[in-house]
């Protein structure tokens, strides 16, 4: 099935040799076919940094029905050790010598349950790598829901996100399977203003909040973004100031809610709603069903905060090597549907801070601190405290040396209830975020633990 799309869409990949891509995919497919004829179905590690090699390898593996594990070529040794122990691959496709020289495992009888499966890496905020198990069908269901929601037949994608991640992979997959066009460039190239001569009005571009923030710092790039058909925004929560800035440039932003497990977005705010002032996640795409449940699994009514729960045709089968034992996927996110049917996400349930018996949601505190314009970055966590149970702790990057905890505390004094205001403040040069802008919460907790000396913290006593 995968190879057939080449014949229908010969010039889909802009800026690259489509014939070269097609030939490489067919060559790799023939190599796999020879193994299959010998009764060998290899588990493949795919860690190509070259775009053409990655796409050709992915298509060949899918066409041959071999289980393929998408990997970040830039993982460090500790991460690769995790991956090799978990996957035990039989074949490695990579242009990185340090990866290629890894010892492969002898082929054993393959569990037929994982044939034709596509394993996509996800680490969440824990930093531990695991793989969500997808198929061509689950990815196709995501594309179909996208097409119906935006009422399109062809999807053109301008991709600046890594193809091994669901955020980049689905941009390629949408264009490839709908006879659309694909442009793939490193984000740094776009940020430098080296942009191909294309009409953005026909394209979707996907960004994470930190990328949007950096592009908006350049008025020329902000104006360029405003010409796109739609600018999808996901990967991490966006802050209100950033959304307002995008709105001021008339950027057709579409904040999304989704994850690796759902093959990207299942809820999206349409650009028209965003430009009219909405700041929520939008409405559910046709291929998904989202419910808000109580702790006792009762469906909650409108405007009641509960646990976000998902059913979707695009839902992963499980985390490799295990399968989910039910179709209902309960998330760690808390949210609610408003009167108009829009999904609003409050934050992660596991990130909720209980301090002195009161519930505090970090996103609210972070938004108040960001609104002061005194910090370049901030993350709020709960630090174990013998008196409060947990103490609200702000870890921040100041805009300049003159900014102190006292300065910020004064600026938010009338913006947050007393119990929501941070009791501890930790200043860093930068926060540990991945390329998507997601915080490594475990690392931040370790940093907070190291700051045990009260003299190192500005305590709000």
Model-derived regions: residue spans:
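Gly/Ser/Thr-rich phosphate-binding loop
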Residues: 204-207, 216-276
């Amino acid at each position: 099935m995968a190879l057939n799309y080449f014949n229908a869409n010969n010039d889909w990949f802009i800026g690259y040799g489509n014939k070269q891509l097609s030939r490489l995919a067919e060559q790799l497919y023939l190599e796999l076919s020879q193994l299959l004829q010998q009764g060998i179905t290899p588990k493949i590690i795919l860690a190509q940094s070259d775009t053409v090699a990655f796409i050709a390898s992915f298509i060949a593996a899918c066409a041959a029905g071999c289980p393929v594990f998408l990997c970040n070529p830039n993982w460090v040794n500790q991460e690769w050790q995790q991956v090799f122990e978990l996957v035990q691959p039989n074949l490695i496709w990579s242009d990185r010598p340090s990866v290629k020289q890894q010892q492969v495992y002898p082929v054993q009888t393959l569990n037929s349950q994982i044939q034709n499966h596509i394993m996509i890496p996800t680490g969440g905020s824990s930093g531990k790598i695991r793989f969500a198990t997808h198929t061509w069908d689950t990815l196709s269901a995501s594309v179909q829901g996208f097409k119906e929601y935006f009422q399109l037949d062809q999807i053109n994608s301008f991709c600046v996100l890594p193809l091994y991640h669901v955020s980049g992979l689905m941009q390629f997959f949408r264009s490839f399977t709908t006879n659309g066009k694909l442009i793939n460039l490193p984000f740094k190239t776009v940020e430098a203003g080296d942009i191909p001569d294309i009409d953005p009005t026909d394209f979707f571009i996907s960004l994470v909040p930190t990328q949007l923030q950096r592009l908006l710092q350049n008025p020329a790039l902000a104006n360029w973004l405003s010409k796109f058909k739609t600018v999808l925004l996901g990967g991490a929560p966006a802050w209100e100031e950033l959304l307002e800035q995008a709105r001021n440039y008339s950027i057709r932003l579409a904040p999304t809610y989704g994850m690796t497990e759902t093959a990207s977005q299942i809820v999206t705010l349409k650009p028209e709603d965003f430009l009219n002032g909405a700041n929520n996640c939008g409405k559910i795409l046709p291929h998904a069903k989202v419910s808000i449940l109580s702790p006792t699994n009762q469906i909650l009514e409108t405007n009641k905060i509960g646990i976000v729960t998902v059913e979707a045709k695009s839902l992963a089968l499980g985390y490799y090597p295990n399968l989910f034992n039910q179709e209902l996927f309960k998330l760690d996110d808390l949210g609610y549907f408003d009167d108009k049917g829009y999904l609003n996400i409050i934050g992660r349930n596991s990130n909720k801070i209980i301090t002195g018996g009161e519930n505090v949601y970090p996103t609210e505190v972070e938004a108040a601190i960001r609104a002061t314009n005194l910090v370049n970055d901030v993350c709020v966590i709960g630090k174990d405290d013998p008196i409060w149970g947990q103490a609200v702790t702000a870890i921040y990057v100041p805009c300049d040396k003159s900014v102190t905890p006292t300065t910020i505390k004064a600026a938010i004094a009338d913006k947050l209830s007393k119990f929501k205001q941070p009791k501890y403040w930790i200043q860093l040069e930068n926060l540990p975020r991945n390329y998507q802008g997601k915080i490594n919460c475990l690392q931040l907790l370790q940093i907070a633990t190291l700051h045990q000396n009260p003299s190192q913290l500005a305590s709000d006593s």
